[in-house]
Amino acid sequence: MSTTLVLRFADVGVATYASLRIIGQPGGTVTWVLHEPIVLAALKELQAALPDPDGDESLTEALDRALTRGPFATAQGELTLAYILGALLISAPAWQLISDCVADPRPVLFISPSARLARIPWGLLAVPLTGPDPEELIAARKAAVTFKGTNAARIRWQLDDIDTVTEGLRLMELADVVLAVPPNIAHAPRIPVQWRERRSAPALLVVDPRVPGQRPDSPLGSVLGRPSSQTALSRHFGELLARRPVLPQVDAAVELFRRTDADRTWLATLLECAPSRLLFVGHASAADRAHGYADRAALHLACTAAAEGAAEPVGNHRPLLASDLMAAALPAPPRVALLACGSGGDYQFDEATGLVAAMVLCGSELVTATLWSLPTTAGYRRFTVRAEDPMAEIVIAVDKAHEDDDAVLSLNRWQREQMRRWRDGDVTASPLYWAALVTFAVGGAR
């Protein structure tokens, strides 16, 4: 049996309180406090790495920055970010407690982030050998609090030689990282479905559905590019078809892509067939934090504006909101993968009722999602001038992992492999993809 640890964060006023404990060991607990200027400093560093617009940036400018100039564009920049996040967000005693639990098999670390820390890629964090001078950190924290409000602390990092402050060991190398399903969702009335009961049933594959009225190169256009039987993804799904039945029933794998019939009625009909798992690859829209409701997060299927739902139409298309999914009580399978822009953003809201919560409330016990927008195949190739397709790689990796007995272990193993490729100089193993993946589990599901 592996050791289980739980890392929790809670925003209370201007501070974020953290605790780390070992399940079954009352004495194995560490607590610490993150002051608002420190949290803001961490978020500012992360924002510079993400392909989401910052300030007046356009989507295109944000993607260009993230792929070519941001911290995730080079191994040195990514390691520096990983070190800064590790030094700011996890206390030295907490790092020590995690290190003390390292064994074979790896411990499992369940993380419940606060709203402020909802998009932190926890597995990426690097173990610091040393951190900022404590007195300088206190001074920077105090200077960040002004009559006009609180700003990000301006910390004087000593980063001329990154190897002197971290050996590059990551949290994902110390433990298998899982996000805990928010308590209000995990304890809500629902009818869960277990993997062992459904594992032999067909997999439901919703792959890059065609959003009505959207050109292939538009913001809601194709994620994977022009369908072809010669692509790595088509070959992967072709091999899957040869081994087992899938939904929808198709004669060739290429027929899974860019379907025009994949609307909410089609989805509901196929979910009634009790599939073993659901893979969705496409577009999602995160709920607007200013709006205040996580259930406004949406999936973009092939639904026209005539479809029933609570979302406002986008041209001739009506998005499928998380609230629509919950209201319809669609029977979700035990495992769900939502490889879509920021689909794992539930924790950004006090009431974590986003897309992940919707799937759990509808029956799922394990949901894999993303923390931020994944660059499309076309976007990646445009700005890197490379022929590789990391979007296809992540889809294949998640699809294979969700077929395994222990999906959590398989996904963490793949992320470690990608991180080590990146660390060893393989520029095609971009952290914009592997670091974005998070898996939510309820009831000890693996």
Feature locations, PLM:
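Extracytoplasmic/secreted cell-surface and envelope-processing proteins
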Residues: 120, 214-216, 287-291, 345-349, ...
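Non-catalytic, solvent-exposed interaction/assembly segments
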Residues: 1-121
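Helix-enriched interaction subdomains in cytosolic or periplasmic regions
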Residues: 74-76, 107-186, 288-312
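Short hydrophobic alpha-helical runs that function as membrane-insertion/retention elements
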Residues: 366-370
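A domain-level signal for caspase-like cysteine endopeptidase catalytic cores
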Residues: 114, 153-292
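Caspase-like cysteine protease fold
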Residues: 179-182, 301-332, 373-446
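Cysteine protease catalytic core and zymogen-processing segment of caspase-like enzymes
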Residues: 260-268, 273-276, 284-365
